[in-house]
Amino acid sequence: HDSDYYLQPIFNCCLINIGDMLDNGTVINGKLIESPKSFQVACTVMTQIIASVASSQYGGQSVDIKHLGKYLRKSREKYTRNYLSKYGDKVDPETLESFVNDRLYDELKSGVQTIQYQINTLMTTNGQSPFVTLFLNIDENDEYVDEVAMIVEEILRQRYEGIKNEQGVYVTPAFPKLIYVLDEHNCLKGGKYDYITKMAVKCSSKRMYPDYISAKKMRENYEGQVFSCMGCRSFLSPWKDENGNYKWEGRFNQGVVSINLPQIGIISGQDEEKFWPLLEERLSLCFEALMCRHHALEGTLSNVSPIHWQYGAIARLGKNEPIDKLLH
């Protein structure tokens, strides 16, 4: 795949370590981007990161929306402080909460709209919109689960509505792709978040997305872990860091090679004795092609793509540091 990019020292697709980049800051075009103080700013920074990453790689990328939850709470806390400072005891708690909720929803709607419109209007250096997937996983163990649920619901609501084309007609945007995770609490069996799944189904019926992933099946197949594919459909294999912790975000796919199984079946003439040797031959070619990709990346310096290697999308290597330790 993507043989025209073979000579460029960059990989195919990845899971951006967006949580680290938002929490600890990043650098884009030589300018320091500090950790956001509000949801709206976090959404803007996230789209800037997506565009920068897409301009420096040829494959898709995925971001986990759960990392925006804490910033929605920051906004709630900010509005609560502001209203308390302004009105104090003049307003009863119920009215105060109503004020905060109204203002928070305005920011939630605006932030999600920023993500959707920025991704669909920004052009990368490749001359195309960023190929990006938003991973919508409502994890009950997340301390910001209520905020994440609000964000996911609004993303689905806006995707259902669509984006206006030049004639002013609402159409289905190509990106971002949406992946919605089904778990025990939202699988339409009386769970707390079933209402969001109903919105997802309604959205899929009109806009084709979201796609769905079963958390139960993923845990069975991936050692109890639930995570997004990279861009469109490539899943990482489980891997633990030096501390024994599973790592998904901040990892990538060095290259992609496909096998045309129907072609092998046709060539073998439905003869199993011919089919298996042919398959072994093709698998050997696949391995050779993948190792060519691997060796082409060896020796690459972090300066080739600072947003990936130096400023958090994949790692935080030093300037001019080889990326080799991330390849093995």
Which residues does each predicted region cover?
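Conserved catalytic cores of very large enzyme subunits
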Residues: 1-327
